[in-house]
Amino acid sequence: RISFDGKHLQSLTPDKGNHEIAFSPSKKYFLDTYSLVNVPPVTKLRRSSDGQEIAVLEKADLSIYKQVGVSPPEVFVAKGRDGLTDIWGIVSKPSDYDPQKKYPVLENIYAGPHDSFVPKSFVPYSEMQSLAELGFIVVMIDGMGTANRSKDFHDVCWKNIADAGFEDRILWIKALSKKYPYVDIERVGLYGTSAGGQNTLSALLFHPEFYKAGVAACGCHDNRVD
């Protein structure tokens, strides 16, 4: 909350997470549901005037995940092409993974400039985890050129959609393999739909030394028809 003069900034949702709120009819109270990609949802009742927590109403139960050995995605951060900028992404691995083995990597790519695409909230069912169960390390990355960061970060894609943040993505995956030897840097593929399909084809055409295979679905391969 903030005053019309730009002063007195006050957070009414202090818990770390991505928040969704719903006000009561009187607007005196609101429900605050928050989560992270690796933290399940919590719902609290708060007072609108100051954000005071009144009650914890619900916490998601992850016991069934633990029973089958599935873990939420891991958040991983590495430096981008400039050596300074943090590049964020997530990693899913098989529930029965063996750290002594090597696993091929699949990148779920979508580098459209109109948003950021790595999920910020908890996802109870994950396509990435389903693919990981087939024996892959599956990753999703927001490289330079995606939105919701600084203007300089976003402007990388200006009149340069083909960039797609590949320099950052490749560095990120290489950093992941340095931390986790079970990540096989010699077997990296990717897949995507729409802009992600275009990105997949671009990866194979312009970065074949790194990306060895790809599946492009409904790719917008000629931006002149957009």
List where the protein language model places each region.
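Serine-hydrolase catalytic core recognition
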Residues: S11-T13, E20-D226
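Beta-propeller blade signature
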Residues: I2-D5, L45-R47
